[in-house]
């Protein structure tokens, strides 16, 4: 299989799509030049259809522009876009104590209380990655940056943003046993469950802000989340990762307890591969690759192609009406995991599946007429919603996926 893939040509395809079509779309269409922050509810052509602002997506867009600045090239327009989004978040995104709201109106007034732990995690990586960009800018001779029309020392701003990232991360870790806190809708004494999504995200967050953390603190955070992902939520008897367990770590026969989310599991595996590389643990990388392949095989729709959104570990009906839809992020994250697995292990199964998922993803999610990609397809692979952004889809999974796959393909070619 490796003999028939032109890695150089494929890397150029991903690079061009990212830099020529996707990033210009968000740079030009999403920035709110009047009130700050970003519009994410963008129709097929980039026109704004709703002006509310969701903290998940605000933080993710800050992170994305910062990551591009740090890993592709230090373009001023990317840094400026990240800073203006971060300043909107710093001013309006939390309650004054870094409890991050879920949603704001266009001007920054809170709409939804800070119940959602992932608002905190995405704020963490946003301010963490931007602090790294600003520190780099300061070292590169850009001693000052423009913030709301004022000139501010880049080093000072980097320090302030790093502090926000670290303090927010501390709050996240303090909430792992009860993520929603006082905003939980569960009845006291109700069925006690824990979910896969938080330890999964923490695997990524820990590496994103690694340079800001004390080594011992970082190591404990990594050890804890790796244990949860690989030893608790991964069930060898199923060969799969489950989305929720009882607090005691046992399987529970209820809707939440039977739920499988192949995309989540597959995405988590490239986080684990990164940690395995960082820790020098090839056996961890190999285990992550095996789980990734098992999840792709299990989640693949053998009739219509693509990966199911939700599944049930006992084959029972799901209550989510969207269970059989094909979503953009699932497929982008799968591409990252598969090509990273091939890069790190040389396992040809990863390359075979990568080609298959690549073909499906590019032929179904990419809009040939307008930039950015569709997010939501029905089971048959037809476009359900022509939007390019909304309450859950923003400047994140498509550009992050394109960036990662481009860089990995380039590295494979160069090696």
Roles of regions detected by a PLM:
Residues 1-415:
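Glycan-recognition and catalytic cores of secretory/periplasmic carbohydrate-active enzymes
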């Amino acid at each position: 299989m490796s003999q028939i893939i032109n890695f150089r040509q494929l890397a150029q395809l991903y690079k061009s799509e990212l830099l020529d079509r996707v990033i210009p779309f968000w740079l030009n269409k999403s920035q709110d030049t009047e009130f700050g922050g970003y519009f994410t509810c963008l129709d097929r052509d980039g026109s704004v259809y709703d002006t509310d602002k969701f903290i998940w997506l605000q933080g993710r867009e800050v992170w994305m522009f910062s990551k591009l600045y740090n890993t592709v090239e230090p373009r001023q327009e990317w840094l400026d876009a990240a800073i203006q989004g971060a300043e909107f978040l710093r001013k309006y995104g939390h309650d004054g104590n870094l409890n991050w709201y879920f949603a704001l109106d266009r001007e920054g007034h809170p709409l939804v209380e800070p119940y959602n732990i992932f608002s905190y995690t995405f704020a963490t990586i946003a301010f963490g990655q931007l602090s790294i960009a600003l520190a780099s800018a300061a070292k590169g001779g850009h001693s000052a940056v423009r913030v709301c029309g004022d000139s501010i020392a880049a080093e000072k701003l980097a320090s302030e943003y790093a502090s926000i990232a670290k303090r927010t991360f501390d709050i996240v870790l303090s909430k792992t046993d009860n993520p929603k806190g006082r905003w939980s809708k569960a009845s006291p004494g109700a069925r006690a469950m824990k979910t896969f999504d938080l330890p999964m995200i923490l695997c990524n967050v820990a590496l994103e802000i690694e340079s800001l953390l004390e080594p011992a603190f970082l190591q404990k955070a990594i050890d804890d989340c790796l244990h949860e992902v690989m030893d608790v939520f991964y069930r060898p008897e199923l060969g799969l990762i489950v989305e929720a367990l009882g607090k005691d770590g046992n399987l529970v026969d209820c809707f939440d307890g039977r739920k499988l989310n192949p995309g989540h599991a597959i995405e988590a595996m490239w986080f684990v591969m990164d940690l395995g590389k960082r820790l020098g643990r090839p056996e961890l990388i190999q285990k992550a690759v095996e789980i990734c392949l098992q999840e792709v095989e299990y989640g693949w729709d053998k009739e219509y192609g693509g990966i199911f959104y939700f599944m049930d570990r006992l084959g029972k009906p799901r209550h989510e009406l969207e269970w059989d839809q094909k979503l953009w992020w699932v497929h982008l994250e799968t591409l990252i995991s598969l090509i990273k697995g091939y890069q790190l292990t040389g396992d040809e199964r990863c390359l075979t599946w990568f080609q298959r998922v690549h073909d499906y993803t590019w032929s179904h999610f990419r809009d040939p007429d307008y930039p950015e990609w569709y997010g939501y397809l029905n089971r048959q692979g037809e476009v359900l919603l022509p939007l390019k952004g909304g309450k859950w889809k923003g400047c994140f999974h498509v550009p992050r996926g394109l960036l990662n796959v481009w860089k990995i393909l380039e590295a494979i070619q160069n090696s």
